[in-house]
Amino acid sequence: REIIAEKNPDLKDKEDVAQKVGIGAIIFNDLYNQRIKDVTFTWEKIHSFDGETGPYVQYTYARAASVLRKTGITEVGEIDPSLVTDETSVALLKEIERFPEVIKVAADRLEPSVISRYVMGVAQSFNRFYHENQCNVEDQKLKEARVKIVILAKQVIKDGLDLLGIQCPEQM
């Protein structure tokens, strides 16, 4: 609760967000590691917004939702692929494209850590994309292309976390 209040004092539904993040942190920590490995559990680590944690992934989802709110675009049709050739955009799109195969591998191995580690990779790729690509730009075609990437990343993060039983707050 304190972390959420500190990060965003004006946030509505602080209690609901804190509950989603707290429960999600525990689930993510448990499912991030392979089932047959011993894990050291510390509250400080699992509640951190830095590193390979559930709150980091949930915060990334909320960041993507914020980008969409700020651009005012919620849907984008086909885009011109020549507009998204920078390294971070391509890397993120390649990561997103792997989602169906990741689900298959996780199911075949009965190993949820495959999904949690994949979702972490998408979150990390998205954050690199976010830091290098402004979405709210004048060029409407470029804006739509970048927003499309945000929409796709947000959806994959949500779907991956849903499979793990973790809820995604729209704001944090």
Give, region by region, the residue ranges found by the protein language model.
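Non-catalytic interaction-recognition regions
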Residues: R1-M172
